[in-house]
């Protein structure tokens, strides 16, 4: 796809990154749109990532200098069921996403990378990954199996399996007795 593909897509993506136009990449959950059930990616492009102060809705906003940075957000685990087969963001989720993005834009000290959710990557990190914009290459994912003692777990599963086989054999014998 456009996030990591080769050929013309690679050339376009590389130019966008080299020209520091990519501000953020947000991966949405699957089944958010009626026309496709695949995960859609939002590219937020910004030609002015320099520090600046501006007015918005009657409030003064300050954006920090985000030159050579890209925010990656993986939103695939967020959202609530809608019309049985679709996913949508509720107000709380929208506020969480918006808060993360705006905090990243304005206050580097308050923003923090969160495993399985968001990561602020530098241009050098993106170049090191050959200009890939696939969020999973940057966002840390937690290996939940890491803390499992394999030998203990395997012994427990084997014991459970032996018990199930014994129960199966007992049930077979009971069935044979009934049908005699």
Where are these regions (language model features)?
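A conserved structural/catalytic subdomain of Rossmann-like adenosyl-cofactor enzymes
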Residues: 1-180
């Amino acid at each position: 796809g456009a996030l990591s593909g080769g050929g013309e897509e690679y050339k376009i993506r590389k130019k966008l990154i080299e020209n520091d136009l990519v501000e953020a990449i947000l991966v949405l959950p699957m089944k958010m749109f009626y026309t496709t059930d695949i995960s859609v990616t939002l590219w937020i492009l910004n030609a002015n990532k320099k520090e600046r102060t501006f007015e918005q809705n009657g409030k003064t906003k300050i954006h920090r200098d985000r030159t050579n940075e890209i925010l990656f957000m993986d939103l695939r685990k967020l959202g609530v069921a809608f019309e049985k087969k679709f996913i949508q963001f509720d107000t709380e989720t929208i506020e969480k996403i918006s808060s993360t993005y705006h905090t990243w834009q304005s206050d580097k000290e308050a923003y923090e990378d969160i495993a399985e959710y968001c990561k602020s990557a530098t241009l050098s990190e993106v170049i090191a990954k050959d200009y890939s914009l696939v969020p999973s290459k940057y966002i840390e994912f937690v290996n939940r199996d890491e803390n499992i003692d394999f030998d203990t777990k395997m012994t427990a599963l084997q014991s459970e399996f032996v018990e199930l086989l014994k129960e199966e054999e007992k049930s077979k014998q009971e069935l044979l007795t009934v049908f005699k």
